[in-house]
């Protein structure tokens, strides 16, 4: 959970998470185990990865399609890293990542109420958008 917290808001692969665990945590773990843990965390609604948005299936622009990793609630990532308010105030980059997670969480709640979805966008040139909200609003009389 600590490694996932360090990579939330990114498109980190299982290999990246595995390397982070090997570097920063004790013990060795296989990629199958990491995958199983992530699946279990998804099933109990602790994490919810955000899919990539592709504006045009026939576009010549290479769009990155990896999911962005997020905790359902940013406080879970903060707790996993053992951080407190002073830690976040003194590390504004980390604070910004958790703030982004909070914004994504709220956008997902609002979009879901409108039968919508939230995606991210990033192309090969580095152009990115943290949140693309798609909602279909149909009013029937």
For the regions a protein language model found, what residue spans apply to each?
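Accessory nucleic acid-recognition modules appended to NTPase machines
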Residues: 1-139
